[in-house]
Amino acid sequence: MTPTGGSCPRYDFAPIIDNRKKLSAVGEIGLDFHYAPETAKAQCDLFAAQLELARELNLPVVIHTRDADDATLGVLDESDFHYGIIHCFTGSVPFERQLLDRGFMISISGIVTFRAAENVREAARYAPDDRLLVETDSPFLAPVPMRGNENEPSFLPYTVHFLAEQRKTTAESLALLTTANAENLLTPSPPNSQL
């Protein structure tokens, strides 16, 4: 397991830069307009700076986006940095398609098991094999049948089994596939960063 580095909500990137050789990605970064939409401009500016940092460090990003689909795509397009994961994906298939077209991987959490999450199931079925990941998003969003508990990594098999049924494959095959995808993206490569 290798850590990712994030900075929230400030521009102090020194801890990330100082630890870059230990990191597998920059994040969780991104936009969340759910609770404070009035901070949208500041969030977009910080997100753009974080994407530039990831570019300089030659690291993928782990992106959080909530109630900010258009703004997320806008910042990504302005930065022209399309290398990483959209974590805990809960968007629509059209939004997913735009992210996939830009080169991102889609990570599915325990939300896929929730009764009201048909849009997440549709997105999970749509994602190509080589662009799919699974995650816990611990300590939140425990999958059914553990919903209501604090989430933990040991619950990931519930998500994998459910997702495998949705994709008409076996849990074992899906686990191997998503593990390989994560390793391919997050295994540190020889440094060629500018910092």
Regions found by a protein language model. Give the residues of each.
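Short secondary-structure capping/turn micro-motifs that flank functional sites
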Residues: 70-71, 115-116, 180
